[in-house]
């Protein structure tokens, strides 16, 4: 049995932990929240640097962060306590911004530029664009070739939806990379998260996966074989950033209220993606056990095929959905079911008010239950010969042919994405 559990553990440990869920969170957030009354009625907010926020509220932030840490230790299973030497001390000298980020246990090298994304209909004609390297910390920036970042200046006023939507993409800009003890850099050895639980620690993108994935609903046998699956931390991030958002609103720093709220929203949206809520969609405990038995006996073909299948399907469906959305926005196709899904409120009556158990018990569970059907539908689409590899006129790759059944599944998942986004934002703004 021990050998079998080891083989099963190795299979799950090798499962691909991908970088992004739903591609550009800002675009989806902009569409999902465009008609939210609480945002439509809100006044423009004044841009403020993090340094100014810390200078004004440093003493009160010490109490907030200590209370958050105590809550996490008491309420989050398998929570790795923050080392005491990382506590936020408002009177300390030195780099206050770095000290604050380390108290949150995020990557202290993140840029935190003052910016908004160039979103559909957002008019800021006299502003310059920022190069991607001033916004993201990654060495390879090709994934963000189509993103455009508009520079803002402290003191200017900007609509809160633009701030919130732009911030919803930020945690993918390096907030959670290199935080484990076996990652490059110095902070992983100090943060207390231990070694990276899954993913390939050699790649900078991979190291953020345990913060953007929530495997909360696997079977007891899976957890026994792979206890490292419990070491995921999106609940911690949501609790941190929601608390900071409410604090910022209460203390009159509305810009940071919306920005922190966008950061919290990111992790909720991540877990609406089924591949972020189930370790190996398309595999039951029984099929995983059989694959593990064969691997333990030396036949690794099924293991390698399962890993490759999940990686390919996740990657291709993300490209498909992102390309579909961008094409619709370029064409102005407002009657598309995908665009309608971002505005659709039909599922919201099924959701309870947002609380700190919501991410695990509502968002992740819903995505977990959809995972196998989603994976099967992607497989059927790919079996038709997609994605397209033929060239059209102009020597450009043809876009993948649409699949009505896959489209219907994606539309329903986007309803979930949008409904949970509105639920979180509405709850926070009504109860700051």
Residue map of PLM features:
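Positively charged n-region of N-terminal signal peptides that target proteins for export
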Residues: 1-4
């Amino acid at each position: 049995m021990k050998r079998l559990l080891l083989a099963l553990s190795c299979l799950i440990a090798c499962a691909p932990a991908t970088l992004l869920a739903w591609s550009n969170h800002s675009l989806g957030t902009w569409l999902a929240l465009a008609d939210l009354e609480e945002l439509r009625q809100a006044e423009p907010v004044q841009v403020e640097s993090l340094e100014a926020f810390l200078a004004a509220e440093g003493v009160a932030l010490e109490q907030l962060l200590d209370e958050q840490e105590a809550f996490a230790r008491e309420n989050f299973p398998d929570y790795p306590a923050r080392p005491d030497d990382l506590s936020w001390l408002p009177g300390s000298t030195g780099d206050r911004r770095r000290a604050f980020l380390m108290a949150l246990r995020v990557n202290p090298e993140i840029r935190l530029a003052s910016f908004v994304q160039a979103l559909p209909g957002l008019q800021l004609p006299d502003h310059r664009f920022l190069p991607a390297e001033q916004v993201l910390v990654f060495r390879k920036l090709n994934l963000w070739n189509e993103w455009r970042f508009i520079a803002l200046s402290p003191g200017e006023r900007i609509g809160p939806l633009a701030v919130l939507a732009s911030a919803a993409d930020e945690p993918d800009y390096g907030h959670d990379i290199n935080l484990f003890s076996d990652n490059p850099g110095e902070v992983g050895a100090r943060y207390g998260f231990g070694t990276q639980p899954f993913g390939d620690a050699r790649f900078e993108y991979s190291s953020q996966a345990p913060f953007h994935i929530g495997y909360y609903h696997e079977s007891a046998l899976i957890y026994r074989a792979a206890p490292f699956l419990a070491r995921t931390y999106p609940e911690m991030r949501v609790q941190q950033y929601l608390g900071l958002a409410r604090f910022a609103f209460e203390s009159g720093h509305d810009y940071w209220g919306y920005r922190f709220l966008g950061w919290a929203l990111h992790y909720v949206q991540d877990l609406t993606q089924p591949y972020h809520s189930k370790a190996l969609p398309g595999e039951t405990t029984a099929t995983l056990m059989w694959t593990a038995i064969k691997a333990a006996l030396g036949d690794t073909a099924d293991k390698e095929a399962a890993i490759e299948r999940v990686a390919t399907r996740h990657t291709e469906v993300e490209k498909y959905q992102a390309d579909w959305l961008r094409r619709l926005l370029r064409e102005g196709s407002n009657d598309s079911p995908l665009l309608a899904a971002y505005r659709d409120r039909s599922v919201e009556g099924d959701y309870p008010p947002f609380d700190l158990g919501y991410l695990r018990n509502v968002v992740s569970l819903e995505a977990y239950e959809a995972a196998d059907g989603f994976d099967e539908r992607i497989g059927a689409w790919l079996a038709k010969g997609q994605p397209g590899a033929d060239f059209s006129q102009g020597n450009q790759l043809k876009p993948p042919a649409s699949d009505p059944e896959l489209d219907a599944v994606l539309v329903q998942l986007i309803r979930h994405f949008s409904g949970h986004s509105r639920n979180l934002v509405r709850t926070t703004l009504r109860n700051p």
